[in-house]
């Protein structure tokens, strides 16, 4: 006799991965509950990560644009804004996103339960509710989409009022004059751009020998130069020995013997999965040292009825990928297999000022693979649209096979790079010979547009062939 459960599936977490899974499940007729530990849906992406940091970046970049525009750039009219004012803009965006996502669940009759979930046995969850009560919930299957949080080394005092992580930085109550950022990954570089754009002194401590080493080296070098040119001090190959909070700021002692002092520290060196409170040992699951779960191609864990998506499974740790992972897991959960799968070349968008975006192979990868490739480039400063709007900093680079003309990689540095990249991505995904750099020469672009950079870069690259 079949067992009766409260739900067909319970999704733990309402971030992009949880939302993708929940929507995919209810659209297939499943009875679904979503457990969210916080009062509002959306997860870290909406409340502490992607949305607020990009809203901050947008506000700061508009201030920079205003102050650099020759129409407004006389010194009597310089635009200034406090960190608190800019945070208010981010709050408005967060509220809009929360209302919209709450509506998705309500329209699709997907139940939202608030509290902390922990496994009791293979098909039972205990839900610790905000009022102190404990509910017992059963489901045939589960999707773990509980996300991640900033990694906290034990020797750093995050209770100090001037020591922040990438979540708590959004609750900063003072006006920073000098910021130390430890960790020059994506988050560290994005916040370095934001603070420097607000005319705050920034020291960026990088534990490696160059910024964002996964990028094409020209893109990484462009960011380094732009930081240097704007006054960001980058210190490569450094690790902290000790971090001490004091009354007026933070002192960082580096293993190299250097000492740095600033009025606050943003620690942005790694993240860890939010799995420690799930009591996974009760269902025979183990995580790695960073709290992450291993999954197969259908996002099943070692327990076939338990799936995991998003940051909690590690790479690529992107909101865009998490939503797709949730959708794929939902299909596998209901049908036993998934027809869809993540695309091989996931685009990368890094929201520094200016933006960086890429898809496909880098020059370094193609050289190591001994692929005969050629390069086509377009400088933004030569595009009419960029000249009109004053976006002179930037470049688009297309890597393509010398013989087949197949596009192998696209890399963009400059304002709107994360949007521009998708034009090239669409062509790269074409089958049956449709992926060719000649498309950009044989099609007609609106004029003037930033998209026209593809035509310029394609002509530049094809003219190099002999």
From Swiss-Prot:
Main enzyme class: oxidoreductase
E.C. designation(s): 1.6.1.1
Cofactor: binding details: Binds 1 FAD per subunit.
Superkingdom of this protein's organism: Bacteria
Main location group: cytoplasm
Subcellular location: Cytoplasm
Keyword terms of this UniProt record: Cytoplasm, FAD, Flavoprotein, NAD, NADP, Oxidoreductase
Cofactor(s) annotated in UniProt: FAD
Chemical reaction(s) catalysed: NAD(+) + NADPH = NADH + NADP(+)
A GO-annotated cellular component: cytosol
Positions with a binding annotation for FAD: 36-45
UniProt-listed InterPro entries: Class-I_Pyr_Nuc-Dis_Oxidored, FAD/NAD-bd_sf, FAD/NAD-binding_dom, FAD/NAD-linked_Rdtase_dimer_sf, Pyr_nuc-diS_OxRdtase, Pyr_nucl-diS_OxRdtase_dimer, STH_gammaproteobact
Subunit structure: Homooligomer; probable homooctamer.
Similarity section: Belongs to the class-I pyridine nucleotide-disulfide oxidoreductase family.
Protein name per Swiss-Prot or TrEMBL: Soluble pyridine nucleotide transhydrogenase
Gene (UniProt): sthA
């Amino acid at each position: 006799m079949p067992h009766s459960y409260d739900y067909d599936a319970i999704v733990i977490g309402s971030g992009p991965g949880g939302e993708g899974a929940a929507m995919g499940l209810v659209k297939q007729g499943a009875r679904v509950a979503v457990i969210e530990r916080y009062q509002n849906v959306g997860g870290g992406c909406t409340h502490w990560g992607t949305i607020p940091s990009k809203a901050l970046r947008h506000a700061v970049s508009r201030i920079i644009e205003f102050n650099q525009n020759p129409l407004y750039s006389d010194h009597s009219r310089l635009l200034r804004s406090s960190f608190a004012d800019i945070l208010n803009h981010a709050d408005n965006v967060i509220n809009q996103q929360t209302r919209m996502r709450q509506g998705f669940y309500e329209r699709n009759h997907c139940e939202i339960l608030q509290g902390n979930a922990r496994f009791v046995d293979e098909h039972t969850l205990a839900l610790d509710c905000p009022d102190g009560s404990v509910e017992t919930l059963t489901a045939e299957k589960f999707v773990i989409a509980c996300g991640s949080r900033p990694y906290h080394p034990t020797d750093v005092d995050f209770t100090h009022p001037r020591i922040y992580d990438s979540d708590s930085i959004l609750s900063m109550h003072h006006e920073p004059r000098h910021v130390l950022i430890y960790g020059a990954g994506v988050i560290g570089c994005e916040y370095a751009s934001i603070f420097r754009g607000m005319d705050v002194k920034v020291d960026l401590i990088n534990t490696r020998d160059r910024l964002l080493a996964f990028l094409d080296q020209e893109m990484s070098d462009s960011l380094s130069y732009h930081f240097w040119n704007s006054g960001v001090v980058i210190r490569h190959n450094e690790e902290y020995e000790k971090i001490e909070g004091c009354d007026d700021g933070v002192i960082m002692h580096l293993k190299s013997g250097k000492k740095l002092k600033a009025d606050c520290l943003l620690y942005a060196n790694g993240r860890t999965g939010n799995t420690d409170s799930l009591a996974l040992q009760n269902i025979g699951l183990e995580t790695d040292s960073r709290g992450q779960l291993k999954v197969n191609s259908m996002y099943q864990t070692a327990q076939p009825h338990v799936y995991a998506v998003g940051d909690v499974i590690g790479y690529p740790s992107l909101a865009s990928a998490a939503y797709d992972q949730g959708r794929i897991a939902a299909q596998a959960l209901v049908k036993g297999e998934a027809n869809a799968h993540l695309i091989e070349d996931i685009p990368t968008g890094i929201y520094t000022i200016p933006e960086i975006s890429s898809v496909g192979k880098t020059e370094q990868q193609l050289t190591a693979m001994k692929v005969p490739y050629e390069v086509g480039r377009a400088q933004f400063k030569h595009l009419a649209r960029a000249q009109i709007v004053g976006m002179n900093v930037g470049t688009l680079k297309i890597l393509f096979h010398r013989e087949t003309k197949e596009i192998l990689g696209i890399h963009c540095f400059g304002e709107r790079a994360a949007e521009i990249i998708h034009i090239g991505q669409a062509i790269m995904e074409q089958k049956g010979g449709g992926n060719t750099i000649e498309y950009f020469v044989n099609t007609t672009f609106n004029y003037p547009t930033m998209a026209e950079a593809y035509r310029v870069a394609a002509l530049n690259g094809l003219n190099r062939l002999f």
